[in-house]
Amino acid sequence: MKLICKLLSVLLCGFLLAGCAPKSESRTFFAMDTVMNLTVCGEEGLLDDLQARVQTLEKHLSVTDPQSEIYALNQNGSTRLSDDTRELLELALGFCRATDGALDITIYPALCAWGFTTDSYQVPDDDTLAALRETIDYTAVTLDGETASIPEGVMVDLGAVAKGYTALVLTRMLADAGVESALLDLGGNIQAIGENPEGRPWGVAVQDPFGEGYLGVLSVTDRAVVTSGGYERNFEQNGVIYHHILDPDTAAPADSGLCAVTVVGENGLTCDALSTALYVMGKDAALDFWRSREDFECILVESNGAVTVTEGLQDCFRAHVDAVTVAERG
């Protein structure tokens, strides 16, 4: 078995095309199983508070920390939740419903069976996959006030939305502090706040899933940019590559014809949740879903190399590839 694992600390390579002014402060640290970098312009002393908030959220939301609320829920079948965890769980279930289960926060047993939680990779047999499919059901999660409950065999994992929610929380903190310019890189989940100090949009490069270069550069202001791609974590067995984005309907890696999805919008949680869901849906269903909503734009990269950009990104995406199709709402 050959392991292929492209774990980029900055998934989108969210570099600054125009840097912060001299008063900027930056902090790099490890949390939520990734490297994070926070850059805040024009305001001193906030980085300690921001990092502490991230670490608190991690303690609540971790699926592996025996002290976390999610761990307690999975072990005991029921637990009381903090305000943060309750809010995120409620919002995550909303995205599960909105995407008709393309995002499912109960996928964790399948991730474990494939070895993506431990890096001990294996391909489950058909009987195992059939049994796993019976455990994937977000509708089995109940939330009654501060208490969450799940039946035996079901397990919750908020990993597909945790960094997006963290971006949302940090954005609120910065707004309360009056910060007008910042760039938050939460392991590739990028949140651009305001313009850069030179009065121009932040530049965020989108990774080319087929190589070391970039598909292009997004110029964004007050936007989140989140990518999900099968190239991020995968393994090869008997000549077949298996990636970590699982289809809840099959409990196996999604075979949707897509290899990367980038979602751009105001809300980091929305972008995080939908980057996974759209990948599972595939191009046609993803574009139909986009046409039904007004809160995001996206870039879809197919396994054959074709790139589709939704029309709302035409003016802010500078492509580095030749053939790009623009999807229209009409």
Residues of each region from the PLM?
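Mature catalytic core of soluble alpha/beta enzymes
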Residues: 2-9, 14-330
